């Protein structure tokens, strides 16, 4: 049985079902679907074609919108924004790479696209040694040619 407690709002074509809970000042609208054991709380906002399932917790001022699906045991909090555009490369030159609207994550290093584009060789070496620099010298021209910094 789903719950909507306190001043939480669910409207539009949004659906909350299963054991899902929406409470505090959370807002769910548009075509958002929340189900299984998901919890949406505090001032979180979910809208458009969002699907949240599993043991996902969305809280704080987090916003999830557009065509995003979140499942499993994820927690999204703070001022986080889940985004539609995500490109992932697995094990490219020994690094996993994820590219979103504003960020690039290479291995365990996540930075704004503009930061990546302007890192010096010294800064790249400080991240993961000479192997990182070798990778960066191959990947950066590829990223530029693909428009990944745009």
Task: Show where each model-derived region lies.
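Intrinsic low-complexity/IDR segments
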Residues: 1, 6-7, 48, 73, ...
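A detector of tandem-repeat and repeat-rich interaction/domain scaffolds
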Residues: 2-83
């Amino acid at each position: 049985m789903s719950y909507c407690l306190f001043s939480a709002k669910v409207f539009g074509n949004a659906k909350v079902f299963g054991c899902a809970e929406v409470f505090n000042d959370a807002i769910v609208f548009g075509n958002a679907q929340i189900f299984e054991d998901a919890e949406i709380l505090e001032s979180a906002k979910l809208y458009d074609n969002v699907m949240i399932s599993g043991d996902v917790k969305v809280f704080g001022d987090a916003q999830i919108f557009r065509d995003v699906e979140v499942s499993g045991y994820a927690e999204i909090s703070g001022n986080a924004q889940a985004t539609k555009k995500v490109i992932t490369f697995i094990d490219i030159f020994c690094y996993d790479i994820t590219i979103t609207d504003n960020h690039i994550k290479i291995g365990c290093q996540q930075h704004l696209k503009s930061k990546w584009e302007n890192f010096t060789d010294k800064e790249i070496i400080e991240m993961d040694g000479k192997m990182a620099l070798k990778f960066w010298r191959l990947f950066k021209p590829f990223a530029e040619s693909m428009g990944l910094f745009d």
